Structure formats: C-alpha cells, structure tokens
C-alpha cells in the first residue's frame, strides 16, 4: 500500500533537542528544552492551549529557528537535506484554488515527479478518487484535510508532522486518517502528531510528550502516561483540569 513511501526514517533517529529556547521579541515560548525522541512509530504531543506544542513542531520541522540551542536528527544538525525528508500537515491546510488532482500534480512536480498514477492512487487511498476534478477549495473540512495528507504522502517523507489534523472533523474522516497514519508508521515513516483528544492519543500513540508553559513535563510510553502519570500537571490535565 505504501510502496512509494521513503522507509529510511530510522537513519534520522534519534531526534535530539538540546537546550532549545524560542524567545521572539522577548516573548519566551519554549524555555531551555531538552528532549530525545528515540522510538519509531507515532509520537503524540499533548498539552494545554498555548503550551508551545505547535511552536515545538515548527522548530522540529525547521519552519522556526531556535533563539538558542540545537536540534539534530541522527546526530546531524537540522538542515535542508533533512527537511526534504519531512512533510507537515496543518490544522487548516492551504490548498490551491484548482482541482484536487491539480493540487496533487503540483506537489508531485516539486519533488520527484512520481507520476499521475501515483497521484491518483494516493487520492483513492484517502477516499478522494471521485473528487479528482472537483475544486479543492470547495471540499468539506474533512476532505480538505485528507487532501492535505495525500499531498504530504506524495512527498515520500521519512518524518511526518501533523498539527491537530483531525480537529472538528467527522468520525469517519478521523477514522480514515488514523488508519492511514498507522499504515504509514508501519511502513517506516516516523509520525509526530499534535492532538487535544485524549481518546485519540490512546488509539494511535506509541509514546506521548506532555508540554506545558514551553517545557516538557513528561515523555513516556502511552500505557504509562495514562495509567501512571509522572507529574501533578499531567494528572490534572487528564482529569480535565488546567493548571496555570
């Protein structure tokens, strides 16, 4: 199913963040953060609103530059070559005001020109084959998110970042996206996924990072995270209480 995906993510692990801060205009968002992501599979990032989750993912993807500190992939500092092996899906994806298929072929032309058949195959995988000629900007929220994921898969990433890609989507779209991500992970793609949905994290995560006020308070396997939270803040978050 994922024969066109790059399966070399293991060479980019571990991902290490060393003493990273992000302090634009003296607004401290990430503070002296140290983190190592060793595992393959799906890593979920959780935390309250404004905790720095999206900023952390953008730092990992190279969309933002740390004020200080270092980010490495497999002992190599984050660079353009590594970024070419990454893709990102945002909560509100930006799509071309063209057809669904044109959105795919445009992305395909940027990278390896894998061909029209692959574009159509990936659209079918995401349940979008009947929308090939449909204007992308007129799709439903769930369909737009599936198209964004299809474009990301077309890039053949070793590491795929997703920033709340299923927020406010219908259950069928959520189920399909989760299924695709599990299959991609099984094919060797490292998934780093932001969500507020505790049940979703239980379904898909291999390990969970909990961040609050720009600091990682916990990074454990999913079963430990939910059964034996290591910090008061984590336990309060899981109980639906926000500790300010």
Stretches found by the model and what they are:
Residues 61:
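Helix-to-loop junction immediately C-terminal to a conserved catalytic motif
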Residues 116-131:
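Conserved ABC ATPase "signature" region
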Residues 135-139, 143:
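Conserved ABC ATPase signature
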Residues 160-163:
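Catalytic Walker B motif of ABC-type/P-loop ATPase nucleotide-binding domains
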Residues 171-173:
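Helix N-cap at the start of a conserved alpha-helix in ABC-type nucleotide-binding domains
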Residues 195-196:
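H-loop/switch region of ABC-family ATPase nucleotide-binding domains
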Residues 201-203:
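A short, surface-exposed alpha-helical micro-motif characterized by mixed small hydrophobic
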């Amino acid at each position: 199913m994922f024969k066109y995906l790059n399966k070399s993510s293991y060479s980019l692990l571990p991902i290490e963040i060393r003493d990273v801060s992000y302090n634009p205009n003296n607004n401290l968002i990430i503070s002296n953060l140290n983190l190592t992501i060793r595992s393959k599979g799906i890593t979920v990032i959780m935390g309250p609103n404004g905790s720095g989750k999206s900023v952390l993912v953008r730092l990992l993807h190279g969309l933002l530059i740390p004020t200080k500190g270092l980010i490495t992939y497999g002992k190599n500092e984050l660079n353009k070559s590594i970024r070419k092996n990454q893709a990102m899906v945002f909560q509100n994806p930006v799509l071309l005001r063209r057809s669904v298929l044109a959105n795919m072929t445009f992305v395909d032309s940027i990278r390896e020109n894998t061909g029209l058949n692959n574009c159509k195959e990936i659209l079918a995988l995401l349940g979008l084959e009947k929308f090939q000629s449909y204007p992308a900007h007129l799709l439903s929220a769930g369909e737009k998110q599936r198209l964004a994921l299809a474009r990301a898969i077309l890039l053949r990433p070793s590491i795929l970042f997703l920033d709340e890609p299923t927020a406010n989507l219908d259950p069928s779209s959520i189920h399909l996206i989760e299924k695709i991500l599990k299959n991609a992970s099984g094919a060797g793609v490292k998934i780093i996924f932001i969500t507020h949905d505790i049940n979703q994290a239980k379904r898909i995560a291999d390990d969970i990072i909990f961040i609050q006020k720009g600091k990682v308070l916990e990074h454990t396997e999913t079963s430990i995270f939910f059964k034996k939270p290591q910090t008061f803040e984590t336990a309060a978050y899981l109980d639906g209480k926000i500790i300010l």
